[in-house]
């Protein structure tokens, strides 16, 4: 079980003070120095940011076949965390490949670079104290190990959305499985490319058996924020 720091109620005035104080200190320091670079040695630590947010940063790495429910569960979890006053950020294929990874294709090299960039971005969020959810097929152990190495073993929690391919194909919201069956999509995971199931995930959820709400409850229990 992963334990998050529970949020603490703060008055609005205290919150504003917390935002103003570092700016005042930094402005005073800059006025007495000609070179700004030494300031980076005094950047706020991860612990400082987690204390401000009253939570711990963590990486929930959702892996599973296309259509398994990764993004759906991630969005539902984000809403529940938000209700509890916890800051969360979702990274998934749609918002990443339309922006920072728009120049990448689906070759083996590009898939690896896609995951590498996602992990580097995720690490920045985690180091800021944000609960970060990545929803990517990430079909091989090698790719998931790469992400873990970048983010850090203690922060990286592998969540396997283990919905069977039959159910994923039945859903086929984007029509990708049908296109892959017709040979229109090459190297499609589960059809023309393999998926290596995680051997020791922190949590495994089969959305063909568990409703989304129940899946989210398991995740909240895992995070100790029920």
Where do the language-model regions lie?
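Extreme N-terminal, non-catalytic leader segments
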Residues: 2-3, 8, 12-15, 19-59
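Hydrophobic anchor at the beta1->P-loop junction of P-loop NTPases
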Residues: 62
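The conserved Walker
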Residues: 66
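Conserved lysine of the Walker
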Residues: 70
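Conserved substrate/cofactor phosphate-moiety recognition/catalytic segment
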Residues: 75-120
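Conserved beta-strand scaffold positions in the cores of enzyme catalytic domains, especially
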Residues: 90, 156-160, 202-204
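ATP-dependent NMP and nucleoside kinases share a basic, alpha-helical "lid"
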Residues: 99-106, 122-180, 187
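Small-molecule kinase domains that catalyze NTP-dependent phosphoryl transfer to phosphate-bearing small molecules
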Residues: 162-218, 225-226
């Amino acid at each position: 079980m992963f334990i998050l720091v529970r949020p603490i109620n703060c008055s609005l005035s205290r919150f504003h003070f917390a935002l103003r104080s570092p700016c005042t200190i930094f402005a005073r320091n800059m006025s007495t120095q000609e070179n700004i670079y030494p300031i980076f040695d005094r950047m706020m630590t991860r612990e400082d940011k987690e204390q401000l947010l009253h939570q711990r940063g963590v990486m929930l790495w959702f892996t599973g076949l296309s259509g398994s429910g990764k993004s759906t569960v991630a969005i539902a979890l984000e809403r529940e965390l938000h209700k509890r006053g916890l800051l969360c950020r979702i990274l998934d294929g749609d918002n990443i490949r339309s922006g920072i990874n728009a120049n990448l294709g689906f070759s083996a090299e590009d898939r690896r670079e896609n995951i590498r960039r996602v992990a580097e971005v995720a690490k920045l969020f985690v180091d800021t104290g944000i609960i970060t959810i990545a929803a990517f097929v990430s079909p091989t152990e090698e790719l998931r190990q790469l992400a873990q190495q970048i983010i850090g073993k203690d922060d990286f929690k592998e969540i396997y959305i283990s919905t069977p391919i039959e159910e994923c194909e039945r859903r086929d919201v984007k029509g990708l499985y049908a296109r892959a069956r017709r040979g229109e999509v090459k190297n499609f995971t589960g059809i023309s490319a393999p998926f290596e199931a995680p051997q020791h995930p922190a949590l495994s959820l089969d959305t063909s058996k568990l409703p989304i709400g129940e899946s989210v409850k398991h995740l909240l229990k895992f995070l100790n924020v029920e």
